[in-house]
C-alpha cells in the first residue's frame, strides 16, 4: 500500500507511490443534455465501481447544475499532488468548467463523496469582465494553491488560448495567467513541468468553428489547429510554437509523469496520429510523429476516407504504457512506450464505432483489418457510438471508457447517442504482457437516466488519477 503520511498534503509524493494507492470505489463524470432535446440541466453523476458493492455499475447520485445548456465537459481539482508538501491543502472540490456557458461550477465532494453538492457558481459575466475569454476547457491545480483553466475563445467566439486563474480557497477569479496580450491564437489542453520551466498547450479551433458541428471545409480553410505552444513557466509567455507536420487538431497533451522528464505525447485527432514532443540537444523543443492510425476507405459515410479520430490519450503512472481511443474506428489501443521514440502496439479492443459489421458504412480498403468488427453487445445492450474519454486506475489494471465526445459532434457523427444516451464501459488491462479485455459485468447505460438519455463525458476518481495530477 501507499505510504501513510499524517502531515502531507493531497495526492501522492511520486507517480510510482500513487500506483500503490487504494482501488477506486466511485467515479464522477459530467452528463450533458445540450443538443439532446431534453430541456434539463447538465449534472454530475456519481457511479459505483466497487465490485463488492450491491450498487456496482450503477449511478448512485446525480447533482444537477442550476442552469441549462452549460455543456459540462472536463473537470479538475482544487488541489492535487502538486501540493503534496502542503498539509493545509485538501482535495475536496471538483472544478467543472462549462464549454459553452463559460461558467465554472465548484462542487463539494469532500463533505459526502457519494453525494456531492454545489459549493459555488462562478458566473460567466465575472470571468468575461476580468479575463475577456469564453469557452472554458481543461482545469489543473497548481503548486501555488491556485487553479488554472484553459480557454478556447474570446467574447465574440473567436480563438483565444488563454488561462484563467482562480484562488484555490475562495475560488475568486484572479485574472489570466499569461502576460497581457500573450494568449495563444487558439486553445484546448495544457500540461506543465516546472523542473524544466515549461508548459505546453494545444489547440482545437475557435468556438465559432466547432460549436455547431464539424465542417470539413473549415479544415481546408485552416480554421482547425495544428500547433503546440511552448510556454516559459516562470515568465508566463510563449517561447516557441511547434508547427506539426501532419498533426491536425492536437487535443490531449501529456508530459511523462516523471517530473524530471523532458518529453511527452499529444494526440492529433483528425490526422489520427500520436506525436512525441521533447527537449532537443540545443535546449529547445521539437516534435516527431511516432504512431499513425491509417484512415479507411469507406462507402456510406460523410467522406470517402474515415480517420480513426484520436480523441483522448493517457499515460500509465509508471510511464510504461500509452492508451488512446479512436472514436470513429471504435477501438482503444495500448502501446508500450518503454522506448518513447518507438512505441510498440501491445493491446487493442473494439468497443463499437462507425465501421461495425451490419452498419451503414462499408469499408472498401483497410490497411489494418481483414474484416469489419462485430458490433459490441454488453449485458444485452448494443453499444452506440465509439470509445472516447478514457481513464486508467492508479495501478494501471482497469481502464474506463465513455462514448460521448461533444454534444453537437455526437449528434452529427453518432445520432444513436442522442436517442440512446452514452455508455460507460470497463476494460481489464494486462500490465505484464500487454492486452485489453472487456469486463462483461460492467455497463452504465446513460440511456436509462430518469430525465432521458444523457451524454456522459470525462471520468474522475476522488483521490486523483493519471490525467488530473501533476508532480513537481
Curated annotation (Swiss-Prot):
Documented EC number(s): 1.8.3.4
Keyword Heme: no
Membrane spanning stretches: none
PTM annotation: The N-terminus is blocked.
Pathway as given in its UniProt record: Organosulfur degradation
Any single Gene Ontology cellular-component annotation: nucleus
UniProt entry keywords in alphabetical sequence: Acetylation, Cytoplasm, Membrane, Nucleus, Oxidoreductase, Phosphoprotein, Protein transport, Selenium, Transport
Predominant place of localization: nucleus
Phosphoserine, modified sites: 111, 467
A Gene Ontology BP annotation from the UniProt entry: brown fat cell differentiation
Disruption phenotype: SELENBP1 knockout results in accumulation of dimethylsulfoxide in the plasma. Methanethiol oxidase activity measured in tissues from knockout mice is significantly lower that in normal tissues.
Annotated localization: Nucleus; Cytoplasm, Cytosol; Membrane
Keyword tRNA-binding included in the entry's annotation: no
Matches recorded under SUPFAM superfamilies: 3-carboxy-cis,cis-mucoante lactonizing enzyme
Gene Ontology MF, one: methanethiol oxidase activity
Family stated for the protein in its record: Belongs to the selenium-binding protein family.
Protein name: Methanethiol oxidase
Lineage, broadest ranks: Eukaryota, Metazoa, Chordata, Craniata, Vertebrata
Amino acid at each position: 500500500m501507499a505510504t501513510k503520511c499524517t502531515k502531507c498534503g493531497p495526492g501522492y509524493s511520486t507517480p510510482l507511490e500513487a500506483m500503490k494507492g487504494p482501488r477506486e470505489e466511485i467515479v464522477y463524470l459530467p452528463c450533458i443534455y445540450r443538443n439532446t432535446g431534453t430541456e434539463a440541466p447538465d449534472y454530475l453523476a456519481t457511479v459505483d465501481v466497487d465490485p463488492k458493492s450491491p450498487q456496482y455499475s450503477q449511478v448512485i447520485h446525480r447533482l444537477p447544475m442550476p442552469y441549462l445548456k452549460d455543456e459540462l465537459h472536463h473537470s479538475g481539482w482544487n488541489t492535487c499532488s502538486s501540493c503534496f508538501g502542503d498539509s493545509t491543502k485538501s482535495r475536496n472540490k471538483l472544478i467543472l468548467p462549462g464549454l459553452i456557458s463559460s461558467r465554472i461550477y465548484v462542487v463539494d465532494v469532500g463533505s459526502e463523496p457519494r453525494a456531492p453538492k454545489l459549493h459555488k457558481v462562478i458566473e460567466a459575466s465575472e470571468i468575461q469582465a476580468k479575463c475577456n475569454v469564453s469557452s472554458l476547457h481543461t482545469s489543473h491545480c497548481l503548486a501555488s494553491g491556485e487553479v488554472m483553466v484553459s480557454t478556447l475563445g474570446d467574447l465574440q467566439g473567436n480563438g483565444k488560448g488563454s488561462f484563467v486563474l482562480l484562488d484555490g480557497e475562495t475560488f475568486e477569479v484572479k485574472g489570466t495567467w499569461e502576460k497581457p496580450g500573450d494568449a495563444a491564437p487558439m486553445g484546448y489542453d495544457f500540461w506543465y513541468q516546472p523542473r524544466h520551466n515549461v508548459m505546453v498547450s494545444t489547440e482545437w479551433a475557435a468556438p465559432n468553428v466547432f460549436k455547431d458541428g464539424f465542417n470539413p471545409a473549415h479544415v481546408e480553410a485552416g480554421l482547425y489547429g495544428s500547433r503546440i505552444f511552448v510556454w516559459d513557466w516562470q515568465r508566463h509567455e510563449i517561447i516557441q510554437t511547434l508547427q506539426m507536420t501532419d498533426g491536425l487538431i492536437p487535443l490531449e497533451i501529456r508530459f511523462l509523469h516523471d517530473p524530471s522528464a523532458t518529453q511527452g505525447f499529444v494526440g492529433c485527432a483528425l490526422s489520427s496520429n500520436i506525436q512525441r514532443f521533447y527537449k532537443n540537444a540545443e535546449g529547445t523543443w521539437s516534435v516527431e510523429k511516432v504512431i499513425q492510425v491509417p484512415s479507411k476507405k469507406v462507402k456510406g459515410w460523410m467522406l470517402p476516407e474515415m480517420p480513426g479520430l484520436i480523441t483522448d490519450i493517457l499515460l500509465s503512472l509508471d510511464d510504461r504504457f500509452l492508451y488512446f481511443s479512436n472514436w470513429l474506428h471504435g477501438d482503444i489501443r495500448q502501446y508500450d512506450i518503454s522506448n518513447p521514440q518507438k512505441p510498440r502496439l501491445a493491446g487493442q479492443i473494439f468497443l463499437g464505432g462507425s465501421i461495425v459489421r451490419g452498419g451503414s458504412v462499408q469499408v472498401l480498403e483497410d490497411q489494418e483489418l481483414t474484416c469489419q468488427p462485430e458490433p459490441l453487445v454488453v449485458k444485452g445492450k448494443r453499444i452506440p457510438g465509439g470509445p472516447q474519454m478514457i481513464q486508467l486506475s492508479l495501478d494501471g489494471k482497469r481502464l474506463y471508457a465513455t462514448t460521448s465526445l461533444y454534444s453537437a459532434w455526437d449528434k452529427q457523427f453518432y445520432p444513436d447517442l442522442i436517442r440512446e444516451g452514452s455508455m460507460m464501459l470497463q476494460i481489464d488491462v494486462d500490465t505484464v504482457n500487454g492486452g485489453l479485455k472487456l469486463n462483461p459485468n460492467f455497463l452504465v447505460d446513460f440511456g436509462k437516466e430518469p430525465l432521458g438519455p444523457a451524454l456522459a463525458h470525462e471520468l474522475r476518481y476522488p483521490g486523483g488519477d493519471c490525467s488530473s495530477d501533476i508532480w513537481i
